[in-house]
């Protein structure tokens, strides 16, 4: 369990408490609210409805639990995720039965793939109506079983405190994840003698946080023998609040670090050992580090297909140390030499401690580090200007990052804007980057930003969103306006489903089937008018010289949400890129430009063109440095 998570009770801490008061007679609905209060759930996101209405009466009276009324249950789920990602605490959402519950399925699945601690409480039709196809009946337990860490149906009102305490414990411990608690309406209305703390019993659930000493010793031995090691860092390091331990271990050993999309910020991007983000749209230096490594030290990462590319050709010469809190992840994709089950924070601390105590000689890896630094310098982040006066989206995001800085929280949905944000925002601190990494959910950014602001009200929160994603959940801007969450939206508006269009350009001969979202030259919808109608201040930007003043103006407004509609060129693309299913060794820095790794043959048709292009890049870098 991480430090932030320890602020919320677990069965161990709950069971150790004495009873503070005699049993109190109350309804199941009131027991739900009282349990949330005891579990320190300070905010919940939801929408009332018939099957959950009993809960909303005692919730109205609660002085400890704030309810945020969203405009769609998907917004409630993503807001709970945003809250959880920023705070490290359990995010809570509430919905009624049937369509209310099914509207939570997408954010639950999203939280499951990104290992987010969430508890979803759903109302259900009365027990006597179950299985009769009653009005607004849906088997939400069956529907969500594949995408939850666990789920419950409470059939006895006396079990409500236990079920909720167990749900919170399951959500936050071990590998975090979503837990659903489904409660029929008659159980909410029935009475019980409320007793806290409840008796808790989770047979077979014993997550391991402390790594085995022998595995740590084996890992340290491999690390000492490696000539080209790399720390492959995933989101589990952020979940464990292990950023300080990671930095200490990397600096002591001098091992270069790559951070996945879900781990951005856990290791400062400005650090000389940081080689960037690996994966389909990662940096050449990060991809090269993995491909040419002789030892991968994978901490809290799951070898996602977007990182590995073609698994058979991924890191072909590397031995693997894989440390993860979830034993099911170890060896799932790649065979490993040293499996380590444990919390990332404890694993890194033990690795450092054992490394310092080791008397064995270690290899000099300075040449390896210099090689990767050379790749990083030769292939820096960059972009092409758009034709005419059209804005380059990368310029917008780069300007935003420079102006707002690394203390803010940045959220993104999925698509080109997500990748540009990952590339052009400078992440220096953990829990400052929220995105839908595993499920790739359009519409994630706005409600997640709302939840992030709820969890960190003193932080500046920016949602970097695309116009396609924005049209799915922009109604939550009204929630933000009414509830007092002054988030900022940087809307990257290219009038298209940008990532789909990019693939159609590259792989479908430019046949743009159903990707254009508006007619050329029209503002449809007019996001300025729309946003103002939703309770926001709205600004439209069409020229480069307007970008910075608009961002500065947005930062001055803190009494309502602000939307900046950046009109950008539709032909901007995300580079570098590894085509789906291809080897990471075939990464393209730009279209047709495949870098060399260690002098290997290029996959390009004409190596001479590659050399010329690389020379031009080198000259440009030298000119910039001069």
UniProtKB/Swiss-Prot annotation:
The keyword Amino-acid biosynthesis applies. Thiamine diphosphate binds at residue 73. One of its GO terms (cellular component) is acetolactate synthase complex. One of its GO terms (biological process) is isoleucine biosynthetic process. GO terms for molecular function: acetolactate synthase activity; flavin adenine dinucleotide binding; magnesium ion binding; thiamine pyrophosphate binding. It catalyses: 2 pyruvate + H(+) = (2S)-2-acetolactate + CO2. It holds the Pfam family TPP_enzyme_N. Keywords: Amino-acid biosynthesis, Branched-chain amino acid biosynthesis, FAD, Flavoprotein, Magnesium, Metal-binding, Thiamine pyrophosphate, Transferase. Residues 416-496 are annotated as: Thiamine pyrophosphate binding. Its cofactor is Mg(2+); thiamine diphosphate. FAD binds at residues 175, 281-302, 324-343. It comes from the Bacteria. Residues 1-23 are annotated as: Disordered. Residues 1-13 have a biased composition (Polar residues). Binds 1 Mg(2+) ion per subunit. Binds 1 thiamine pyrophosphate per subunit. Pathway: Amino-acid biosynthesis; L-isoleucine biosynthesis; L-isoleucine from 2-oxobutanoate: step 1/4; Amino-acid biosynthesis; L-valine biosynthesis; L-valine from pyruvate: step 1/4. Belongs to the TPP enzyme family. Contains 1 molecule of FAD per monomer. The role of this cofactor is not clear considering that the reaction does not involve redox chemistry. Dimer of large and small chains. This is Acetolactate synthase large subunit. It comes from Corynebacterium glutamicum (strain ATCC 13032 / DSM 20300 / JCM 1318 / BCRC 11384 / CCUG 27702 / LMG 3730 / NBRC 12168 / NCIMB 10025 / NRRL B-2784 / 534). The gene is ilvB.
């Amino acid at each position: 369990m991480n430090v932030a998570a320890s602020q919320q009770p677990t069965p161990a801490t709950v069971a150790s408490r004495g009873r503070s008061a005699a049993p109190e007679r109350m309804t199941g609905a009131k027991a739900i609210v009282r349990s949330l209060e005891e579990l320190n759930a300070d905010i919940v996101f939801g929408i009332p409805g018939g099957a959950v209405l009993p809960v909303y009466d005692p919730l109205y009276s609660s002085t400890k639990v704030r309810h945020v009324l969203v405009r769609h249950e998907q917004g409630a789920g993503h807001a709970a995720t945003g809250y959880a990602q920023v705070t490290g605490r359990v995010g809570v959402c509430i919905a009624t039965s049937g369509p209310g519950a099914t509207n939570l399925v997408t954010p639950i699945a999203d939280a499951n793939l990104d290992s987010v601690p969430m508890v979803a409480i759903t109302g259900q039709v009365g027990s006597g109506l179950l299985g009769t196809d009653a009005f607004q009946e849906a088997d939400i337990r069956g529907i969500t079983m594949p995408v939850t860490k666990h789920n419950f149906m409470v059939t006895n009102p006396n079990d409500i405190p236990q079920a909720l305490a167990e749900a919170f414990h399951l959500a936050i411990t071990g590998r975090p994840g979503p837990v659903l608690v489904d409660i029929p309406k008659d159980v909410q209305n029935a009475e019980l003698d409320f007793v806290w703390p409840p008796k808790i019993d989770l047979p077979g659930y014993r997550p391991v946080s402390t790594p085995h000493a022998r595995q740590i010793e084996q890992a340290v031995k491999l690390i000492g023998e490696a000539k080209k090691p790399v720390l492959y860092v995933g989101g589990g390091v952020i979940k464990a609040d292990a950023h300080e331990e990671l930095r200490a271990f990397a600096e002591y050993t001098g091992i270069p670090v790559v951070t996945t999309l879900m781990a951005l910020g856990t290791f400062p991007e400005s650090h000389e050992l940081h080689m960037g983000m690996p994966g389909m749209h990662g940096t050449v230096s990060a991809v090269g580090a993995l491909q040419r490594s002789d030892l991968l030290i994978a901490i809290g990462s799951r070898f996602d297909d977007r990182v590995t590319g073609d698994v058979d050709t991924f890191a072909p010469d590397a031995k693997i140390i894989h440390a993860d809190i979830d034993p099911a992840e170890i060896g799932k994709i790649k065979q490993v030499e040293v499996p380590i089950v444990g919390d990332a924070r404890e694993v890194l601390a033990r690795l450092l401690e054992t490394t310092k105590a080791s008397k064995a000689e270690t290899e000099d890896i300075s040449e390896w580090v210099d090689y990767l630094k050379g790749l990083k310098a030769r292939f820096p982040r960059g972009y092409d200007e758009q034709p005419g006066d059209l804005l380059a989206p990368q310029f917008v995001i780069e300007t935003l990052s420079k102006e707002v800085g690394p203390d803010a929280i940045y959220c993104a949905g999925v698509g080109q804007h997500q990748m540009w944000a990952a590339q052009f925002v400078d992440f220096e601190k953990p829990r400052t980057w929220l995105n839908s990494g595993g499920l790739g959910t359009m519409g994630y950014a706005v409600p997640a930003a709302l939840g992030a602001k709820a969890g960190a009200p003193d932080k500046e929160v920016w949602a970097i969103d695309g116009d396609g994603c924005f049209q799915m959940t922009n109604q939550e801007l009204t929630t933000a306006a009414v509830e007092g969450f002054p988030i900022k939206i940087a809307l990257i508006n290219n009038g298209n489903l940008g990532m789909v269009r990019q693939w159609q350009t590259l792989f479908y001969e430019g046949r743009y089937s159903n990707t254009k979202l508006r007619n050329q030259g029209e503002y449809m919808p007019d996001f300025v008018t729309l946003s103002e109608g939703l309770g926001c201040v709205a600004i439209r930007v069409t020229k480069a010289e307007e970008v910075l003043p608009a961002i500065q103006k947005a930062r001055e407004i803190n009494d309502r949400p602000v939307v900046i509609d950046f009109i950008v060129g539709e032909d901007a693309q995300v580079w570098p890129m590894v085509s789906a299913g291809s080897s990471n060794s075939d990464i393209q820095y730009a279209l047709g430009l495949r870098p060399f790794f260690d002098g290997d043959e290029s996959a390009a048709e004409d190596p001479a063109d590659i050399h010329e292009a690389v020379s031009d890049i080198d000259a440009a870098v030298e000119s910039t440095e001069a």
